Amino acid sequence: MLSGVTDDGSTQSGSLIDEIVREGARRMNAHDIVQEPDEHARFAAYLDQLQQVAKADEVDLISHVLSDPDQTMAQSAVLRHLDRRAADLHLDPAYAKWSKAMAQAVIGHSFLTRRLHEWSLFRAITLTLSWRPDDLLAASDWLQLKAAVESSTAAIEILAEDGRTKRIRNTATVSLKRQSQR
């Protein structure tokens, strides 16, 4: 398990990234390590650590993952974490506090910021809170497709008519038909 993190991002036994890599390597057998590039080992280790991180340490760990020199890999690991946590929390009142903390952690990473915003929009649609149809229509294909499958009738109707892609429109149309058969 990770040891305490100091202000400069290091731990008692070295940098947090080095410690995560060592932890990931420890969990893999030697044959896998030889064949797998470093960024793959770090990615697996990051996912493992993000899966297990305590709520109080989540922002710090995300910040450290995002400081990895391989930004594509680091952001991918954080994206998976955000999607997993948001899927678990979006119907819960705790989501608001969590999403604010995550927004601070991902400042400067536009794709991650947008994904958090889209999770908040999905939450608003699902819980029938205030939301604007134009925001849904301007959202990514990812959110439109997700909303076409598992959101409010109002959102699904909008997407059946004006969804960005044929796939989104067709998925929304099928969802509406299923809802009417219930």
Model-derived segments and spans:
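Alpha-helical scaffold segments
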Residues: 2-182
